[in-house]
Each structure stands twice: as structure tokens, then as C-alpha cells.
């Protein structure tokens, strides 16, 4: 199995290197990520860091104090993306049962929930599907959670939550 992974990894690296030449410009989010690109022209890759729209993702001046009778947890993302599906299932199946207090509620907010995500809905778990203003969801939450066990890169959802 290790041999197959090595062969496939090498094939993918060659493919990515060839594809690099088909584009006039290249961007990446960090200098460290750029160092991982095995191409002779990697120093020409433009670094464009992730960020959030501060006009939209800003703390509310009118947020009510936390309600001790109901604690609101939030996880956001495209709910058809495999790492988000995995995180949602992990939250509901592994973490929520550990929270013995019945006043803890979880909102899974995000577009296109797969059947596995929709099936997680319960009295304590709300699956929203698409929401018009995700910033409102962040403001309503007491705590944002992002138990991502798969995927790579800087998650904008974490930046959005920190800004809200």
C-alpha cells in the first residue's frame, strides 16, 4: 500500500507541475504553502492571504448576554464537502453525547447538506441548509466549533468566527 501511495504521489506531483505552465498567474495563501510547490517558477507565485470582510463579520453591539438555559454551538460550511460532512457527523455522534446538559444545542449551517448531514437533525441539532447571512449565525452562537479532521489549508470559517 505504501508503494502505491508513493507512486501515485509522484504522478500527482508531475501532473501538478505540468499544469502550472498552462496558467499566466498563480496565487497561494501563504509563503509556507508556496515553499511546498515543487516547480522551478514557484517564487513567482503571488501570495494573497485569506481574510474576511470586516463590514460583514463584526461583533454585534446589541448581542444579548448568553442565555444560561440554552447554549448555542455552531459549525458552518458547505455540507456536501467531505471534510465538513465528517466534522458534522463527528460533532453529533461523538461530541454531543458527551455534553450531558440538555440545554446545549448545535446548529449545522451551510448549503447543500448531504443526506448524512440532514439525518443528524434532532431536538438538539438544527440543520439549516443555505442561510442568507452566515454572519448572523455566528452572532447568534455562544461558541463556534470546527472539528475538522480532514482537509487542508486555512479555514475561512475560523477567521469569520473570530471576527464575529
Tell me the role of every PLM-derived stretch:
Residues 30, 77, 148:
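Glycine-rich, N-terminal phosphate-binding loop of Rossmann-like dinucleotide-binding domains
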Residues 5-59:
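Donor nucleotide-sugar binding/catalytic pocket of nucleotide-sugar-dependent glycosyltransferases
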Residues 1:
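Conserved nucleotide-sugar donor-interacting segment of glycosyltransferase catalytic cores
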Residues 12-13, 21, 46-140:
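Conserved catalytic-core segment of nucleotide-activated headgroup transferases in glycan assembly
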Residues 161:
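Donor-sugar nucleotide-binding helix/loop cap in glycosyltransferases
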Residues 35, 82, 152-153:
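Short glycine-rich, flexible loops that bind phosphorylated cofactors or substrates
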Residues 7-10, 126-127, 152:
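Short gly/ser/thr-rich secondary-structure transition/capping motifs
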Residues 24, 139-156, 164:
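Acidic donor-binding loop of glycosyltransferase active sites
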Amino acid at each position: 500500500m505504501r508503494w502505491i501511495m508513493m507512486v501515485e504521489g509522484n504522478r500527482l506531483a508531475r501532473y501538478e507541475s505540468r499544469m502550472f505552465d498552462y496558467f499566466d498567474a498563480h496565487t497561494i495563501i501563504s509563503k509556507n504553502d508556496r515553499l511546498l510547490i515543487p516547480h522551478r517558477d514557484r517564487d513567482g507565485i503571488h501570495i494573497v492571504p485569506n481574510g474576511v470582510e470586516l463590514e460583514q463579520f463584526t461583533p454585534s453591539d446589541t448581542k444579548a448576554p448568553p442565555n444560561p438555559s440554552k447554549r448555542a454551538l455552531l459549525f458552518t460550511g458547505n455540507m456536501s464537502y467531505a471534510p465538513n460532512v465528517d466534522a458534522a457527523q463527528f460533532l453529533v455522534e461523538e461530541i454531543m453525547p458527551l455534553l450531558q446538559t440538555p440545554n446545549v444545542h448545535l446548529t449545522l449551517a451551510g448549503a447543500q447538506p448531504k443526506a448524512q448531514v440532514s439525518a443528524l437533525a434532532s431536538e438538539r441539532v438544527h440543520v439549516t441548509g443555505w442561510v442568507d447571512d452566515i454572519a448572523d449565525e455566528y452572532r447568534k452562537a455562544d461558541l463556534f466549533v470546527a472539528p475538522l479532521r480532514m482537509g487542508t489549508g486555512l479555514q475561512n470559517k475560523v477567521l469569520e468566527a473570530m471576527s464575529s
